[in-house]
Design a protein with these regions (language model features):
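Short, positively charged and aromatic/hydrophobic N-terminal segments
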Residues: 13-26
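N-terminal transmembrane-helix/juxtamembrane module of multi-pass inner/ER membrane proteins
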Residues: 29-105, 151, 160, 258-259
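Aromatic-anchored segments of alpha-helical transmembrane domains
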Residues: 61-63, 131-137, 204-215
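Membrane-interface loops
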Residues: 69-83, 113-197, 245-259
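Hydrophobic, membrane-inserted alpha-helices
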Residues: 104-108, 181-186, 205-212
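Interfacial helix-loop-helix junctions of multi-pass membrane proteins
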Residues: 169-172, 208-234
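C-terminal membrane module of polytopic membrane proteins
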Residues: 220, 226-259
Length: 259
């Protein structure tokens, strides 16, 4: 009689092989349930159009911020620091605000991309132009600066050294920290249903971020207004020119191709 088991298991009894089958069945079922839970979580977190815009912009930001760092070391770099920058002291403790900004952006972006489709499409189009303008500034104004020597042994100094070790003194003007923080606050200001306290919190946090980027010597003063302008101009244009129509046009084109 021909065995129903695979060749490697010809000499394994059912009592030995059976539990393995049950284990694989249970494991497969758990993986399937885990996949369903992840899908349900994603749907509850953001609508489909919100995920589409978020993932596209996140990928574009990575493409803008990291690949051009390969070219910048070979370009003639500019020092945009002024006498006022030299008077700003180095304060390692401000690295906490600098790092907490990433969590603040994540929370705010979730709130923004949960809004109505018109709102999401308009803000996404504005952020798209913001990223393109930022990339143009990075290439046309290849600014750099000299980091201070961090010799402290305290916790904050260790964090600063960690940031310096994974970063490079390029892509400075405008400050992406200021760009993202201002964009988040500005979009919250025009969004309905956002608690007033959270809008005020984001404005205060924006001011703290502007201070942190110069106190930890990641940027110079001119990078701050540059970041505000690069964020504000696209938002004004998007609202006046109704750039949400771009999102609707792309959605309609995708729908027609899917038919």
């Amino acid at each position: 009689m021909k065995s129903c088991f695979p060749t490697p298991f010809l000499h394994v009894s059912f009592l030995e092989y059976g539990p393995l089958l049950w284990y694989n069945t249970i494991l497969t079922g758990e993986k399937r349930d885990m996949g369903k839970r992840i899908v349900n979580w994603a749907r509850n977190l953001l609508p489909g159009y919100g995920w589409a815009c978020f993932l596209f912009l996140a990928a574009l930001q990575l493409l803008i911020f990291y690949p051009n760092r390969l070219l910048l070391p070979y370009m003639n770099k500019l020092d945009l620091s002024t006498v006022w920058d030299a008077r700003i002291p180095f304060r390692p403790a401000w690295i906490v605000i600098y790092l907490l900004s990433f969590a603040s952006w994540a929370i705010t972006f979730v709130l923004l991309f949960r809004q109505r489709k018109e709102h999401v499409y308009r803000n996404s189009a504005a952020y798209l132009l913001t990223l393109l303008m930022t990339f143009a500034c990075f290439m046309l104004i290849p600014a750099t600066l000299e980091w201070p020597e961090v010799t402290g042994k305290d916790f904050f100094s260790c964090l600063v050294r960690l940031v310096y070790s994974v970063d490079q003194p390029y892509n400075l003007c405008p400050s992406l920290h200021v760009v993202c923080s201002y964009y988040c606050w500005r979009c919250l200001y025009d969004t309905e249903g956002i608690p007033r306290w959270y809008r005020h919190f984001n404005f205060v946090f924006l001011l703290l971020v502007c201070c942190s980027v110069v106190f930890v010597k990641q940027h110079v003063l001119v990078d701050i207004p540059a970041g505000i302008l690069v964020s504000e101009i696209p938002l004004l244009l998007a609202k006046r020119l109704r750039w949400e129509r771009l999102g609707y046009a792309i959605e309609e084109r995708i729908r027609k191709k899917g038919q």
